[in-house]
């Protein structure tokens, strides 16, 4: 095994012993390279010498002289202790990298420089003195940079500049003061896993092309089903491109379970189907209904209480109404952690109703599923074990890098029967291994990204207790924020009571509005406060928090905490920053 000090740039011989007898030189290599045709020799010499004289090119101007960078050594020892020679990327293009002949050294040099750019960005992401975003309006970015695609290739110096520019204007989602979305933070193990996944660059449809990843998906989904509460982790599941697709999978499977003929005959052979979900549920239920031909009018929205929880009596009433009209209720989607309020529907009561009327029960726990990792908070999902299917997004509350969403199904084989098409060029039945590990035919997609490795590697690094600590910390920070602002001058809570999740919903009331009566004029003026403060946050780059209206409530801030880097001091900063930016409104 090579010692830790052998370094990134070392090239091991086949037996790992190295060869110290033939040191070689850049000059010797350059002389050999001149025998190659097509300009390869000149490019290799430029690579070896860096600041050497540029080769002449007929019929065109010379590229601008670029800063030389250190690259792989010029000797042939494996490993060696030579100092790295200079690389001038103005002479190099993507065609000089692997799999090009002699592309190893420029490839290592290029990827090392890309890695340096990425690592600098990672470090800056956690620096509170840096901006969350260097905001520019779309027309400014379009005018300042040429983003158009060209017919001719650019050199690698320009490619590296594009990498830097892209990250310069990207949102630092790992910044401790980024609270804008449900998915925040930047986990180092998850990041490493994502790099590995991209390097492996394989598909998830069969065991033969993704043996380890397929097994990890099997192990991880089984563990998630155990945590849900299904005996022995039995059932099925798949990682999908996001919670919206996971929810649509659930609708497809529920429909197939009730009417398996839909797979061949389509919706024309079915009665009108009706799905039920709360008025605070995610819009993906209606999108799924539209995509599946069920229609958005066939998604009935159930009333919620003042905390955003589905009212079971209204659910039962609407089911009976649909049945009286001759419609067929086929799915109830309860939400465990709504997007805005963070509400948890009463799953036990919903399960009783679904059992009574023989309706598929789905739980959209995309946001709230992470609480199942916490012994302190998992009670909020009591009844999830009675669901027929569950959506769970580890890329939200568990901090796994995007994307990582799972659909879990209680009945094994149902997903396969619903979606399989028996493509013989992929799913041959006479393979030499257990075909149950060829999982691709149960997916809607053919090409499917490897999403499991990030979650699996983070789970190995943290353990279940590590995820639990993260969840508990985030909910404690949410309660800390709530306790500060609930009685603070200039703040009004959108609903009474401490947060159910990490969602803290509130209005900031500027001094000019604090003495006004609670009437239409005040509401109209208040609706403009959050958008202006949010715009100022982005222009200063200090923090980011989302806002939205909901029902008859005008724009309010929705603070969500899933960022592992956030601390009590960041919550204090947020409050002070909102007051600073909104004081004059």
UniProtKB/Swiss-Prot annotation:
The reaction(s) this protein catalyses: L-glutamate + H(+) = 4-aminobutanoate + CO2
Modified residues (N6-(pyridoxal phosphate)lysine): 396
Superkingdom per UniProt: Eukaryota
Assigned keywords, A-Z: Cell membrane, Cell projection, Cytoplasm, Cytoplasmic vesicle, Decarboxylase, Golgi apparatus, Lipoprotein, Lyase, Membrane, Neurotransmitter biosynthesis, Palmitate, Phosphoprotein, Pyridoxal phosphate, Synapse
Presence of the UniProt keyword 4Fe-4S in the record: no
GO biological process: chemical synaptic transmission; gamma-aminobutyrate shunt; gamma-aminobutyric acid biosynthetic process
UniProt-listed Enzyme Commission number(s): 4.1.1.15
Name of the protein in its database record: Glutamate decarboxylase 2
Origin species: Homo sapiens
Gene: GAD2
């Amino acid at each position: 095994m090579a010692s830790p000090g052998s370094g990134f740039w070392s090239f091991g011989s086949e037996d790992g012993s190295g060869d110290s007898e033939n040191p070689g030189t850049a000059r010797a290599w350059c002389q050999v390279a001149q025998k190659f045709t097509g300009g390869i020799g000149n490019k290799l010499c430029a690579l070896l010498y860096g600041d050497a004289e540029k080769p002449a090119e007929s019929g065109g101007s010379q590229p601008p002289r670029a800063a030389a960078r250190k690259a792989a050594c010029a000797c042939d020892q494996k490993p060696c202790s030579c100092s790295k020679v200079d690389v001038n990327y103005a002479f190099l293009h993507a065609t000089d990298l692997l799999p090009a002949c002699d592309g190893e050294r420029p490839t290592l040099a290029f990827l090392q420089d890309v890695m340096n750019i990425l690592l600098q960005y990672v470090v800056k992401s956690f620096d509170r003195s840096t901006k969350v975003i260097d905001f520019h309006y779309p027309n400014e970015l379009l005018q300042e940079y040429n983003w158009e695609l060209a017919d001719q290739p650019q050199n690698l110096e320009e490619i590296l500049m594009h990498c830097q520019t892209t990250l310069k204007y990207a949102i630092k989602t790992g910044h401790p003061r980024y609270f804008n979305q449900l998915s925040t933070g930047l986990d180092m193990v998850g990041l490493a896993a994502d790099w590995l996944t991209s390097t492996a660059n394989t598909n998830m449809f069969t065991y033969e092309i993704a043996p380890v990843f397929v097994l990890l998906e099997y192990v991880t989904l089984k563990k998630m089903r155990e945590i849900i509460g299904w005996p022995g982790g039995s059932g099925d599941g798949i990682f999908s491109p996001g919670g919206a697709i996971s929810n649509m999978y659930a609708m497809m499977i529920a429909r197939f379970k009730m009417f398996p003929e839909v797979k061949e005959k389509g919706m024309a052979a079915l009665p009108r189907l009706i799905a039920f979900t709360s008025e605070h549920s995610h819009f993906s239920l209606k999108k799924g209904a539209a995509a599946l031909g069920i229609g958005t009018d066939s998604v009935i929205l159930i009333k919620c209480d003042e905390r955003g929880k589905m009212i079971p009596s209204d659910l039962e009433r609407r089911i009976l109404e649909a049945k009286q009209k001759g419609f067929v209720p086929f799915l109830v989607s309860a939400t465990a952690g709504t997007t805005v309020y963070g509400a948890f529907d009463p799953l036990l009561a919903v399960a009783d109703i679904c059992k009574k009327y023989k309706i598929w029960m789905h739980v959209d726990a995309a946001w709230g599923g992470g609480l199942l990792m916490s012994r302190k908070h998992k009670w909020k999902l009591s009844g999830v074990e009675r669901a027929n299917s569950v959506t769970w997004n580890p890329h939200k509350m568990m901090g796994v890098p995007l994307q990582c969403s799972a659909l879990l199904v209680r009945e094994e084989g149902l997903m396969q029967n619903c979606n399989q098409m028996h493509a013989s060029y992929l799913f041959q039945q006479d393979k030499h291994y257990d075909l149950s590990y060829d999982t691709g035919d149960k997916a809607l997609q053919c090409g499917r990204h490897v999403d499991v490795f990030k979650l699996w590697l983070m789970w190995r690094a943290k353990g279940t207790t590590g995820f639990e600590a993260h969840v508990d910390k985030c909910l404690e920070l949410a309660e800390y924020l709530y306790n500060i602002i609930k009685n603070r001058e200039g703040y009004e809570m959108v609903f009474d009571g401490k947060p159910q999740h990490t969602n803290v919903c509130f209005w900031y009331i500027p001094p000019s509005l604090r003495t006004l009566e609670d009437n239409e004029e005040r509401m109209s003026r208040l609706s403009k406060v959050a958008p202006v403060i949010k715009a100022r946050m982005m222009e200063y780059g200090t923090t980011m928090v989302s806002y939205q209206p909901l029902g008859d409530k005008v724009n309010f801030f929705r603070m969500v905490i899933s960022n592992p880097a956030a601390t009590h001091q960041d919550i204090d900063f947020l409050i002070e920053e909102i007051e600073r930016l909104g004081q004059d409104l």
